[in-house]
């Protein structure tokens, strides 16, 4: 049985564009197949959700503060006026340690605003080893296009 999707065309377009928008079938399977093909081609991959991303550059590359959930408890003068803040390590901190290129696959990318998507494209331009794939919704068959083309339309 021949392979239905070798991933070679997707990889070539991802390397040239840097940031891709993907519309994948809702039953799944196509994205994991592409991730497996990218890993076999020498990429490091990281799969995460776009929900709660905040400022993409800070969240991915810098140590940043996150407020824990409230859970209905009263703070009795323990924190500052803004409440407790926990320092969190960057999401892609350890992934960038080697020389391998990195693919960040963002699920549920349709929740991101236009400015957040543009900032992701700028990150790919500034960091040549970083490639970003954003799932922008479902489709009957797997299709992709550069993010700049999607945002220009």
UniProtKB/Swiss-Prot annotation:
Keyword Nucleotide-binding: no
Broad class of enzyme this protein falls into: translocase
Main localisation: membrane
E.C. number: 7.1.1.-
Membrane topology: Peripheral membrane protein
One of the record's GO cellular component terms: plasma membrane-derived thylakoid membrane
Keyword Cell inner membrane attributed: no
Similarity annotation: Belongs to the complex I NdhN subunit family.
Record note on quaternary structure: NDH-1 can be composed of about 15 different subunits; different subcomplexes with different compositions have been identified which probably have different functions.
Protein name: NAD(P)H-quinone oxidoreductase subunit N
């Amino acid at each position: 049985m021949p392979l239905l999707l070798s991933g070679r065309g997707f990889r070539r377009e991802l390397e040239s564009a840097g940031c891709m928008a993907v519309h994948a079938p809702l039953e799944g399977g196509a994205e994991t197949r592409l991730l497996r093909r990218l890993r076999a081609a020498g990429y490091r991959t990281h799969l995460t959700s776009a929900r709660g991303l905040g400022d993409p550059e800070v969240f991915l590359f810098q140590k940043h503060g996150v407020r824990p959930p409230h859970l209905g408890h009263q703070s009795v003068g323990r924190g500052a006026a803004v409440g407790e803040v926990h320092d969190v390590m960057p999401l892609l901190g350890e992934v960038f340690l080697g020389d391998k290129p990195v693919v960040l696959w963002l699920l549920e990318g349709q929740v991101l605003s236009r400015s957040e998507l543009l900032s992701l494209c700028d990150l790919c331009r500034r960091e040549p080893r970083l490639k970003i794939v954003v799932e922008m919704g479902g489709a009957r068959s797997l299709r992709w296009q550069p993010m700049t083309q999607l945002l220009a339309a």
